[in-house]
């Protein structure tokens, strides 16, 4: 029923510029917890490497992917109980996300509570640009398979309706865990686990022969499964990396204010190092518990990067930017290593930033390093809190002037500087 359009439109490696209002809420794909998760029966036989990823492809080729289920609109209506309000998981500029149920074998709609739970993203009618962003996501997630990329189960295209069906991520987004009022604070170990998983996802995209630049790496697009394994979602802004002797891709400035690399904002020249910068911002959010942009703060403190950067290379002052909700329960050496890594990722000179594979290696090394016993006297060691393995966890000093409830205010996306196009930001 109209699931595959016969069109010559291509998802091209250099010129498409999807609009900025869609897919800003993939972070809320799974804001409610469910005991049901996507079983192995939904594993998609897509590329585990993008070495031979065929681009550009026609729309017909993309939508005829054998890896995806072509749902009818009626099937998804049944799966979500006619998109009822009590099935709504979240909404944003792009549209709405609903909780749905499908049979694990046939992938047909099933009764609520039976089969497996999925997240159904229903896009608003946004015309050609909205369709292009939707198609870009189908193109990439329909071909790629990796433990740290969210799994796309299928899609629906009928008339003006554009929907995507994903595996359900019961722990929701990293953004919600860090910034939502009342959320339980993440432990140091979980924060590093999330960072490592996200780094694995980006490394997979960057190191492929047919490189993919994610272009919208942020806490809202990092989804978490029941064990806090992180997966990248929302590939609507993804771009094919430079080929041949090219060093960058020239494109209209798109992304999210506070996460976008400064050289990309200024020139429109996109490289994998742009993603590295964005990763540095998210790593900083994990360390500090503060948003990339917070308009409720004053002056330089509105920008997390501007505010935190002076402290990242100073062991004695690093505690000033650490999330007070950690209660000082983090290894000082590990925190300094992570902060130093964030500082490298945020280098204003893109060429001096590390590759994501190098970032991942550092994080893996950090996770495998056991916390030391510090330099305190014997009594201090006895009184020190201990981790699950019995090792002493350094309790870093608190900056009590920051011990107040965080303001959970969604930052507005300020206009970014332009080069020769008017940027669209989320």
Curated annotation (Swiss-Prot):
Assigned keywords, A-Z: ATP-binding, Cell membrane, Kinase, Lipoprotein, Membrane, Myristate, Nucleotide-binding, Nucleus, Palmitate, Phosphoprotein, Plant defense, Serine/threonine-protein kinase, Transferase
Domain Protein kinase: 83-366
Bilayer topology term: Lipid-anchor
Low complexity: bias regions: 7-42
Outcome when changing residue 2 to A: Drastic reduction of plasma membrane localization and strong increase of nuclear localization
Residues with lipid group (S-palmitoyl cysteine): 4
Localization per Swiss-Prot or TrEMBL: Cell membrane; Nucleus
Active site residues of this protein: 216 (proton acceptor)
EC annotation from Swiss-Prot or TrEMBL: 2.7.11.1
Catalytic reactions on record: L-seryl-[protein] + ATP = O-phospho-L-seryl-[protein] + ADP + H(+); L-threonyl-[protein] + ATP = O-phospho-L-threonyl-[protein] + ADP + H(+)
GO molecular function: ATP binding; protein serine kinase activity; protein serine/threonine kinase activity
Modified residues (Phosphothreonine): 72, 251, 256
Keyword Nucleus attributed: yes
Residues bearing a lipid moiety (N-myristoyl glycine): 2
Any coiled-coil regions, as ranges: none
Domain of life of the organism encoding this protein: Eukaryota
InterPro entries given in the database record: Kinase-like_dom_sf, Plant_Ser_Thr_Prot_Kinase, Prot_kinase_dom, Protein_kinase_ATP_BS, Ser-Thr/Tyr_kinase_cat_dom, Ser/Thr_kinase_AS
Cellular compartments per GO CC: cytoplasm; nucleus; plasma membrane
Modified residues (Phosphoserine): 250
Record PTM Phosphotyrosine, positions in chain: 166, 264
Pfam short name (any one): PK_Tyr_Ser-Thr
Residues reported to bind ATP: 89-97, 121
Function recorded in the entry: May be involved in plant defense signaling.
Assembly description: Interacts with the Xanthomonas campestris effector XopAC/AvrAC.
Family per similarity comment: Belongs to the protein kinase superfamily. Ser/Thr protein kinase family.
Name of the protein in its database record: Probable serine/threonine-protein kinase PBL3
Organism of derivation: Arabidopsis thaliana
